[in-house]
Amino acid sequence: MSQVEKSNEYYMFEQKCQNLLKEPEIRFAGLINPMGHLVAGGMKKGMKPLEDDADMRKLYMELILRVSTRQEFDQSLGEVEYSASRRKKAVVMSFPIDNKVLLVSANTDVDIDVTAKKIKKIAGI
């Protein structure tokens, strides 16, 4: 993929992340590249992050590693549509997109399946 194509792809995902952040239950929406870097999106304006920058970078790296490890089972179990964790302070969902991951965190009171469907619709995945 050329630099221009990458740039256009990341711009497209920036727009999708911004659309996700308009939803009241969404705290964070970002695209993580295969190197574990946030390349589009981020935290909703006015929202206080639950992790500092260093911990977020660790989270991104761990997420990419986990998603790539899960792909080993795609042949037998089918591709992962999304993964979700309900934590005490946030619901965290990840959506594999080729070799990247859309990472979304939401308020704890969300219905995970309903929210995941909404995210997939808004993000076009």
What residue ranges belong to the model's regions?
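Non-catalytic interaction/Regulatory regions outside core domains
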Residues: 1-125
